[in-house]
Amino acid sequence: MARTPWLPNAYPPARRSDHVDIYKSALRGDVRVQDPYQWLEEYTDETDKWTTAQEVFTRTYLDKNPDLPRLEKAFQACNDYPKSYAPYLHDDNRWYWYYNSGLEPQTALYRSKDSSLPDLSTADGSGGDLFFDPNALSNDGTAALSTYAFSDCGKYFAYGISFSGSDFVTIYVRLTDSPLTKDVDAKNDKGRLPEEIKFVKFSSIGWTPDSKGFFYQRYPDTSTVTQENGPIATEGDLDAMVYYHRLGTPQSEDTLIYQDKEHRDWMFSIDVTDDGNYLLLYILKDSSRQNLLWIAAFDPANLGPNIKWQKVFDEYHSEYEIITNKGSLFYVRTNESAPQYRVITVDIAKGNEINELIPETDAYLSSITSVNKGYFALVYKRNVKDEVYVYSHAGNQLARLAEDFVGAAHVSGREKHSSFFVELNGFTSPGTIGRYKFTDPEEQRWSIYRTTKLNGLNTEDFEASQVWYESKDGTSIPMFIVRHKSTKFDGTAPVIQYGYGGFSISIDPFFSATILTFLQKYGVVFALPNIRGGGEFGEDWHLAGCREKKGNCFDDFIAATQYLVKNKYAAPDKVTINGGSNGGLLVSACVNRAPEGTFGCAVADVGVHDLLKFHKFTIGKAWTSDYGNPDDPNDFDFIFPISPLQNIPKDKVFPPMLLLTADHDDRVVPMHSFKLAAELQYSLPHNPNPLLIRIDKKAGHGAGKSTQQKIKESADKWGFVAQSLGLVWKDSTEQPNL
């Protein structure tokens, strides 16, 4: 199709105030920074009118795309296939697993009729009975199951529900013999207990061994908690507390276990060891890979603020994760003196004596699970490709599983069980579940339990490869490239380039029927550079993209585009960059930083665009470990020059740009996208390409979105790319060029 016509200088107006913030700079003293759209940080009638006008304006442009209806229909069709996830045997001796028949708004929790392993290879893939259906909680699919935990006795099911994508969760409890389905009358739900635990955020649910109650993290009782149909809470997250809730009592009687009034922005996680003998308290000050770890003997008669904690690791310099324990001997995954991670033991009965069990290797130890009362299932990441191994508790390697698989692996298992499952996914692999059963003969222990079958999409028509390229400073960066086999690498193909690069998060090969369909329909190539700042190669790789080195992330991403064009994977003017959250920052910063004409289009999802104020909202203070603290004069000097909002060049042409946010995003609050959109439209009113913002309703940062919301958003987002670049819909019957 032809590019959608664009008339510059027609944006909805936004009032510019004379608001100025003063920051301290180590190099320049007081620095005055104008913030004319500071008023967009608050939910007022003026903000509502501006966002409504922007929604109408953007919708008008998107709806001019003649391909939009069939693109949405194609995305709906390609996602309409049964999706099952690895089953998990709980203490009621029944198997539980997530299942979605295809287009249900939220994935539901199913369970087996008895202790027999369910058959998930049946035609519909459900393999059992519906146990918990989040779709019964709302008419529009915006209530989501965020977390859950079964009691050790198997009688109770505690579950956290979030509404409209908020990070805030309310915990409820129901009897496991009373499933929640759409047939249950919500007003007369006899299976749900009176429990209603509010103000919960970033929390697990940790049942005590006696099944009389559970631990959780909450924030103070305030009126600013994000509500389902109201404005979001934007204040900074302060005063987290760990509580114990006893079943049958009101939340007001819950017992405070721990809080730190001197460090109001610290967060906590509490758990009980599998043997029921110890409490584990993790204390985090930010998003870095560092935490404190305290351990205490579990005493049901002494659950309160006077618990005597043994401060096993009490300095912030490394990450410590308990894998399992044998009495007082604890097995720990850590990056202490090991950027790629290793396994150590610490004996708390012997003065916290430490010994190395599994040394650091040249691959990143991304996860380790204790299984079968004496074994570990490890996932190593080597060049962004997962490898799964079985080790003994003595630290000896026994087997490698699925050696020919290229992609990402996730292990699901428990120490008390004689088998575990591995979920395998890749760019052209929609989902395979393997099972390792210790009780079988050694050569028969590994088998394929379930393979996902698609409807209307042949993954054999696509191929994925990995290349390496040099960044600006000479660092070698890996990049995956995916294409439909009919798409040629001759310098004419449009490319979607996706990135993240932050918080030690590895962006592994993943399956997306939506992306593959877009590649097929428009002859597009998908590229994923694994830039610095992520966790693909351990902690050193992460730190190479943090704080004063954050610019490395942007340089890596820009160099990826230049490599794609130079080597004819991409047409010079048709590379679209995309990323979400920290990846949204990546997109807006790179558009500012790259030479004019580097990108053909840019799409930034829920991005962190105001690096001078991110730390003042919700969980933002925790991100200072990656971004730096704008209130620190030394940090300000490396943050200010890269913050997208304050560094829009007014003398260069911007590519078509779409910012996406949501009205209930209380992780990266929407003010980031609001202010950047307003500033872009003011600073570049005559830009020959559109600079738009899409604002989702009753949605948050991403988690909990309904299937329908995801499909609609994908159609708008990728449709914007197609209409902005003038992409042509290909005949779907075209045969691959083998």
Swiss-Prot record:
One term under GO cellular component: cytosol
Subunit structure: Monomer.
Function: Housekeeping prolyl oligopeptidase (POP) that behaves like a conventional POP by cleaving peptide bonds on the C-terminal side of prolyl residues within peptides that are up to approximately 30 amino acids long.
Superkingdom of origin organism: Eukaryota
Name of protein: Prolyl oligopeptidase A
Family: Belongs to the peptidase S9A family.
GO process terms (BP): proteolysis
Cleaved signal peptide residues: none
This enzyme's EC code(s): 3.4.21.26
Amino-acid biosynthesis recorded as keyword: no
Annotated InterPro entries: AB_hydrolase_fold, Pept_S9_AS, Pept_S9A_N, Peptidase_S9_cat, Peptidase_S9A, Prolyl_oligopep/macrocyclase
Keyword vocabulary terms for this entry: Hydrolase, Protease, Serine protease
A molecular function GO annotation: serine-type endopeptidase activity
Family annotation (PANTHER family): PROLYL ENDOPEPTIDASE
Catalytic activity as recorded in UniProt: Hydrolysis of Pro-|-Xaa >> Ala-|-Xaa in oligopeptides
Species lineage: Eukaryota, Fungi, Dikarya, Basidiomycota, Agaricomycotina
Catalytic residues, chain numbering: 581 (charge relay system), 665 (charge relay system), 701 (charge relay system)
